[in-house]
Amino acid sequence: MKSQSLPVNILALLDSIINEAVSKISEFTTKPTAFSRHRVIDVSKLIMLIINMQSESIQKELFKNISLSGCSIAASAFVQAKAKLKPDIFRYIFDQLNMNLASLKLYNDEYRLFAIDGSDFNQVWNPKSENIVCFEDSNRKPYCQVHLNALYDLENKIYQDCVIQPKNKMDERKAAVEMLSRLECGKYIVLMDRGYLSFNMIQHCNVNKDCYYVIRSKTGFTAIKEISQLPDEEYDGILDCWVTTSNHFYTQNKDHLNIHLVNIHLVNHVNHQYKKFKSKNSKDNSWDFKQFCHVRFRVCKFRINPDDAPNKEQWEVLVTNLDADKFPLERMKELYNLRWGIEKSFKMLKYDDCGIQFHSKKDEFVKMELYAHLIAYNVIMNMVNQAYAPHPKSKSNSEYQINLSMAFFIVHFSRYWIAEEGL
């Protein structure tokens, strides 16, 4: 197969998934009778329009995509038609697209490699929104914001899963557990920053036989007690802890148990609010396991900056269940650095794919457009991954570095022309 024909496959796949969703459109509409009559623009073209929209006003976006819609459509008619759809249809397309992607790269030829992180998206002020963020200080104005929790494939540069939450109800750990519980891809490694570390998160990963995790830990007094007590030197070892939700057991034993053999940590159980005795090292409000639970994990500590580096941390600590023989300290450091790929992806999603530009202040429309941008991002990055641009003067088969900003612009501008012409 010629490399230039590969992008057509992903576009054809997207179109087939859209057509499949449209075939059962009643499951994704606000009313069962929606789109039952002939309209100026059919629902499949409406969905394509929403996915292909960028940062211009609705009128300009409709004009740019007039060849796609096949007719001139007023902005008001477009909004009315859009209001008949549920965001669920874009979630369905997003999931189906990911399920059907082939030839995915593996880290070390063995693992899918993911990162979990979140990013905020501002929406236009809407006093009726559920996404309003308020302040106790009356001098600060409230605003509307949603938080995108994402599971990102670092090797294939695609968003595998997401959870969209109101900023005022954001729970990144809960979202991470939810996304990992849905993941069925064989063995994988997931990288998370220090805000995700908790005993509940560690244990959820431990009980999943396919899950290998690397979670950055805090290093100061707010870290897990055993980690905060580590000396300032390289360390690579196993820690065993007991986690309990029993206030009685904790208070009776915390002062005299041999801390090197048995470590007791109190967490807030949904049915047991022991805030008075809650360990400062266990600030997770969730515990999804039994009253007494043994938690085991590997701790890796290594230097990242010299002692004289101003205003920089000297040491980094990672919590993991990866084998020390296969992943020694130096390799753990290199592996965790790959997490920055998700930070770069958020920048491209927001600015290259215009993900920060919403065309409505309604909550449902904002969620709909976020899913649409994730779909467009995955399609374009899949095309970039398959593109082959050899350097004409290279003798080592090196390739040109593809300009991703231009790739997003070109695909959005000419997407359906490419699909129709077969270029």
Residue ranges: model-predicted function:
Residues 134:
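Extracytosolic and intramembrane catalytic regions of membrane-associated proteins
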Residues 89-100, 104:
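Short Lys/Arg-enriched helix C-cap and helix-to-coil transition segments
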Residues 1-56, 64-65, 69-72, 77-85, ...:
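Single, function-defining residue in the core of a domain
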Residues 112-114:
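Conserved beta-strand elements of the Class I
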